[in-house]
């Protein structure tokens, strides 16, 4: 999911 990539970036 796109959300996983967002939190993974942080």
Curated annotation (Swiss-Prot):
It is found in: Secreted. Expressed in the antennal lobe (at protein level). The modification Arginine amide is found at residue 10. This is Tachykinin-related peptide 4. GO terms for cellular component: extracellular region. It comes from Pyrrhocoris apterus. One of its GO terms (biological process) is neuropeptide signaling pathway. Keywords: Amidation, Neuropeptide, Secreted. The lineage of its organism: Eukaryota, Metazoa, Ecdysozoa, Arthropoda, Hexapoda.
